[in-house]
């Protein structure tokens, strides 16, 4: 219902309650252009209505006949109603004190970080920092993360986060496969590694021919393995001295990966000091809530010789055009968007926002604060060990940091029963043993409650905490010789921001350097940078969602699982498929899971030999990278002059590989921003040759409510909840990449048997460390769908298409639109061809991207899917005013280019070639350029009231890769 102007309402009497209710109010805030603006844009395009435009854009053969079947969520809820409904679900969760451990620990999120990072749109609405000049704040925060990890692990270099610890372990395995012992395909996993890590490793190893062996760590050197994974400390709490074992593994030609707890490394000798080649782990306990499994930032650190084989993003130091230090993403030629099937990993989205939180936790506490936390945790564990021994129980592990495995024998069930009565969760190690992992939130009272549980089971009296503390002198339970002596976190950034005032100002100084959605539109094609509404974000910080351990008993997570079930059904309705799994914690992992499901389907039919994956030449780089990881052979299908899949070439390739055809991976609408007219035919050709159709859901924002991959021939898709369904990009993560499948593939959806989650008996192995992946951000998408309802979700899609066509129409006289469908129309994005400009003026797409920064904009997607182009996606959330501001900037830039073409501006000394212009450059005493300072900094009048200044000049990418430096920069360099 449209909210009418109050003056018009006042003239009506009487007013009914129904007339005053505004259930659609959220949709009107989410969708940027109002009715008048939409009509003005439609007039520009020559259409009378949105419906008429959509009829012209989307092929009639694939249009949805019915309204989105959202059931109880078909009608929109107001923001208050949706929050209240979600609160009912959250209250069904039981937040126990969880001492389960197994890689997840409760933690205190410092309030200054909670409010000023996690809840701050300047951080969470930013995109991956591919444009370094407008990303210096989060690049510095991520560089801090890398420095933190490298220092604590004792290794040379760390990446800027991975998806979770289990995924990081799998990435380390494949890294060593590429670089290690050529005569072995064995990866050896010690039997005290986290069980969920082992399961993800097994999932990853099978398609690429790696044999995973498990057994005692002591036997690793005799396994003839190219790599060995050790846990430090082990899942049962043991802290073992691996120095001699590491030497033996190296002597046998193998390499060593260590899964290490970063908090423990403040007091334990780091893996790098005793010869480890790679360290991986999770930074969750550095201030990031457990969140029923995620999101959390994993890490991967390596010796220097492996740096060019690392997966994931890597922040490096370079210089800008003025020779000043600048940060950028380094060694991007390793990544999937460039190397495709030869990439080191398929990871695209990682966990930047959570890595930033973890790094700021280290900045805020500093080395002394972290060590104090670690020593206190270790002391509590030692007091617990002493107490349970007094009560007659034996501890299985004599060495420990924070985890005890306690032999409870026949009293095990009683221990769990008495713990439950005190709202405590313990780890169920076996029928005769329990595990207890304490953390920084464990208090004296908590310790007393734990002792009371064991005392009750023993039929005795719990020893007093103070008495235990007084009687236990100097016991750290760490092996002799493994106490850390090396310094860490010595850089000034970890030693100066310890007051809240200093921390607050540091965080503000970083966020002020960056350009995020809170400042302006981010028109990145294929990225869908839409509104991340505050009401959607609020539940993320509710303790009923954040305080749940991923392996908590099912009866404590009723609300979570009900919300997850509802969200899965919402996505089933949107996609037209039969079932959805929310386990994949990034789009790349959803792709990977989908391809494994296809393989499992073929294998179940006796056709495991089908391993050829057809991929159009225009595909996103994750597609071939994922296919390679899934053990498939990539065969490229040509595209025609209009950017569509070449049907003749598809038929030829399908015929050639008919016996071995596993799948085709297509994106719809295509990566060229067009609804291909023959998508049904593409699906039919592949099906006729025995293959399955994988429809990449990256562009789902152009389909919701209007068409559905499950209805036009798709068998499986992944979605990006961080695109279409409003989870923010976080500066490079978190993301969620659900996999949606047809009915015939539903029984192959992923399980996680190691933790008791079995969705389907025939399901593939786990693809994430937690059963539901990044569960704590799923409420964002639930809220979005609940507040929009069926009609408004469709309206959002239509408006996204309208906005894209409006931009294409307005800019077409200035920049050719490379691809379009019938009537010259595009889908939800358009590609502007700058190649003729390069030929006529020497101005490159990079020059235009950097010049847009001077106008206050993040550049559109550069040179994808076609080199020398810009791909623009405005989404439905941008108003006509903001679209017009972007259009005006692009037209003004075209005029600047024209001045070069006509000889009125020098081909080198012009505002594009020297962009972006910093405040320091513009205000310097000396100005040697042929153009004015005003043209450099204020090329359009609107900048006079709202000017963003890039903090650095153009970053030198070549210098940065040739002089790779990925640690924090000394203060002297900024002088």
From Swiss-Prot:
Q: Which cofactor does it need?
A: pyridoxal 5'-phosphate
InterPro entries documented for this protein: GcvP, GDC-P_C, GDC-P_N, GDC_P, PyrdxlP-dep_Trfase, PyrdxlP-dep_Trfase_major, PyrdxlP-dep_Trfase_small
HAMAP family on file:
GcvP
Subunit? The glycine cleavage system is composed of four proteins: P, T, L and H.
- UniProt modified residues of type N6-(pyridoxal phosphate)lysine: 723
From the Swiss-Prot or TrEMBL record, give the protein name. Glycine dehydrogenase (decarboxylating)
Record GO terms (molecular function)? glycine binding; glycine dehydrogenase (decarboxylating) activity; pyridoxal phosphate binding
């Amino acid at each position: 219902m449209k909210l009418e102007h109050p003056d018009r309402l006042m003239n009506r009497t009487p007013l009914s309650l129904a007339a005053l209710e505004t259930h659609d109010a959220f949709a009107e805030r989410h969708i940027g252009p109002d009715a008048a603006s939409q009509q003005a844009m439609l007039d520009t395009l020559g259409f009378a209505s949105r419906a008429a435009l959509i009829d012209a854009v989307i092929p009639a053969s694939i249009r949805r006949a019915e309204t989105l079947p959202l059931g109880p969520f078909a009608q929109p809820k107001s923001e208050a109603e949706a929050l209240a409904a979600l609160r009912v679900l959250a209250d069904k969760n039981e937040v126990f004190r969880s001492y389960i451990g197994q890689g997840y620990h409760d933690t205190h999120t410092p309030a200054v970080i909670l409010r000023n990072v996690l809840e701050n749109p300047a951080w969470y609405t930013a995109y991956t920092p591919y444009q370094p000049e407008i990303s210096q704040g989060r690049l510095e925060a991520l560089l801090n993360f890398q420095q933190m990890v490298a220092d604590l692990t004792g290794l040379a270099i760390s990446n800027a986060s991975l998806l979770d610890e289990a995924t990081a372990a799998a990435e380390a395995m494949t890294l060593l496969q590429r670089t290690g012992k050529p005569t072995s395909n064995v990866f050896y996993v010690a039997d005290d590694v986290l069980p969920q890590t082992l399961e993800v490793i097994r999932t990853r190893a099978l398609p690429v021919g790696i044999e995973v062996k498990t057994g005692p760590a002591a036997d690793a050197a005799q396994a003839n393995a190219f790599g060995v994974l050790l846990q430090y400390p082990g899942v049962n709490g043991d802290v073992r001295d691996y120095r001699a074992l590491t030497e033996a593994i190296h002597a046998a030609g193998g390499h060593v990966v260590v899964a290490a707890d970063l908090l423990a490394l403040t007091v334990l000798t780091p893996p790098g000091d005793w010869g480890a080649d790679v360290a991986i782990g999770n930074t969750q306990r550095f201030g990031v809530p457990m969140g029923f499994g995620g999101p959390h930032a994993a890490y991967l650190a390596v010796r220097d010789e492996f740096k060019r084989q690392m997966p994931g993003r890597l922040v490096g130091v370079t210089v800008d055009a003025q020779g000043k230090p600048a940060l950028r993403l380094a060694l991007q030629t390793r990544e999937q968007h460039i190397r495709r099937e030869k990439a080191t990993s398929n990871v695209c989205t990682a966990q930047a926002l959570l890595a930033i939180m973890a790094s700021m936790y280290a900045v805020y506490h500093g080395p002394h604060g972290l060590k104090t936390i670690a020593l206190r945790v270790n002391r509590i564990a030692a007091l617990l060990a002493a107490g349970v021994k007094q009560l007659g129980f034996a501890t299985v592990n004599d060495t420990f940091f924070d985890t005890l495995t306690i032999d409870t024998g026949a009293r095990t069930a009683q221990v769990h029963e008495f713990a439950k009565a005190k709202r405590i969760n313990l780890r169920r190690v076996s029928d005769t043993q329990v595990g207890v992992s304490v953390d920084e939130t464990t208090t004296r009272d908590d310790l007393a409650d734990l002792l009371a549980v064991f005392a009750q089971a023993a039929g005795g009296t719990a020893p007093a905490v103070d008495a235990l503390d007084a009687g236990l002198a100097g016991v750290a339970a760490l092996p002799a010789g493994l106490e850390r002596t090396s310094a860490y976190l010595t850089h000034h950034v970890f030693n100066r921001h310890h007051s809240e005032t200093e921390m607050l100002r540091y965080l503000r100084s970083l966020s002020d350097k960056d350009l995020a959605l809170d400042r302006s539109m981010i028109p990145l094609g294929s990225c869908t940078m839409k509104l991340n509404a505050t009401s959607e974000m609020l539940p993320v910080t509710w303790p009923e969602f954040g305080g749940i351990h991923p392996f908590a008993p099912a009866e404590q997570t009723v609300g979570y699982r009900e919300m997850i079930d509802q969200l899965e059904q919402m996505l089933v309705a949107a996609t037209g498929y039969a079932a959805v799994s929310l386990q994949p914690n990034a789009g790349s992992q959803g792709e990977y899971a989908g391809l494994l499901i296809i393989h499992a389907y073929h294998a179940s039919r006796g056709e495991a030999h089908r391993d050829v994956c057809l991929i159009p030449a225009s595909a996103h780089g994750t597609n071939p990278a994922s296919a390679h990881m899934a053990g498939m052979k990539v065969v490229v299908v040509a595209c025609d002059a209009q950017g569509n899949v070449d049907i003749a070439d598809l038929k030829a390739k399908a015929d050639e590989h008919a016996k071995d055809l596993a799948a085709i991976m297509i994106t719809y609408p295509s990566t060229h921003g067009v609804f291909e007219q023959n998508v049904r035919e593409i699906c039919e050709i592949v099906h006729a040759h025995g293959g399955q159709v994988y429809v990449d859901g990256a562009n789902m924002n152009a389909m919701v409510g209007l068409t559905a991959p499950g209805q036009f021939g798709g068998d499986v898709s992944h979605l990006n909840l961080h695109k279409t369904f409003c989870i923010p990009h976080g500066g490079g993560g978190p993301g969620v990449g659900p996999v949606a499948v047809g009915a015939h593939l539903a029984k192959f959806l992923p399980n996680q048997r190691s933790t008791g989650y079995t969705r389907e008996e025939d399901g593939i192995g786990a693809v994430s460390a937690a059963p539901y992946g990044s569960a704590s951000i799923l409420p964002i998408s639930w809220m979005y769908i609940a507040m929009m309802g069926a009609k408004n979700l469709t309206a959002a899609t239509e408006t996204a298409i309208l906005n894209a066509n409006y931009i294409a129409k307005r800019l077409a006289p200035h920049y050719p639109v490379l691809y379009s469908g019938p009537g010259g129309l595009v889908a939800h994005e358009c590609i502007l061809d700058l190649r003729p400009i390069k030929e006529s003026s020497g101005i490159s797409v990079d020059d235009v991207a950097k010049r847009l920064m001077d106008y206050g904009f993040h550049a559109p997607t550069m040179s994808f899917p076609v080199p020398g182009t810009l791909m623009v996606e405005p989404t439905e959330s941008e108003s006509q005013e903001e679209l017009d501001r972007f259009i005006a900037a692009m037209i003004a830039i075209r005029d600047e280019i024209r001045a070069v073409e006509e000889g009125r501006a020098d081909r080198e000394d012009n505002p594009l070639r020297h962009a972006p212009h910093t405040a320091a450059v513009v205000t310097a005493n000396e100005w040697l350029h042929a153009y004015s300072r005003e043209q450099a900094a204020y090329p359009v009048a609107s900048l006079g009231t709202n000017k963003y200044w890039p903090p650095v000049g153009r970053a030198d990418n070549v210098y940065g890769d040739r002089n790779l430096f990925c640690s924090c920069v000394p203060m002297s360099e900024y002088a």
